Amino acid sequence: MVKKTIAAIFSVLVLSTVLTACNTTRGVGEDISDGGNAISGAATKAQQ
């Protein structure tokens, strides 16, 4: 019982941290897109 409670609290904390870091589900997509753009830009610079 105690292990389940601790696991539930930990899960809520992790989930809230992830959602807060990205602000919203839309923010997650923007973060991933920005990361892809940064990688693409770095690859283009490396080719030049």
Curated annotation (Swiss-Prot):
InterPro entries per the UniProt record, alphabetical: Entericidin (IPR012556)
Keywords linked to the UniProt accession: Cell membrane, Lipoprotein, Membrane, Palmitate, Signal
Compartments, record wording: Cell membrane
Lipid-anchored residues (S-diacylglycerol cysteine): C22
GO BP, one annotated term: response to toxic substance
Membrane topology type: Lipid-anchor
Lipid-modified residues, N-palmitoyl cysteine kind: C22
Cleavable signal peptide: 1-21
GO CC annotation terms, alphabetical: membrane; plasma membrane
Similarity comment: family membership: Belongs to the EcnA/EcnB lipoprotein family.
NCBIfam families found in the cross-reference section: PRK10081.1
Functional description taken from the UniProt entry: Plays a role in the bacteriolysis. Is activated under conditions of high osmolarity by the factor sigma S. Entericidin A functions as an antidote.
The protein's name: Entericidin B
Upper lineage: Bacteria, Pseudomonadati, Pseudomonadota, Gammaproteobacteria, Enterobacterales
Gene, per the UniProt record: ecnB
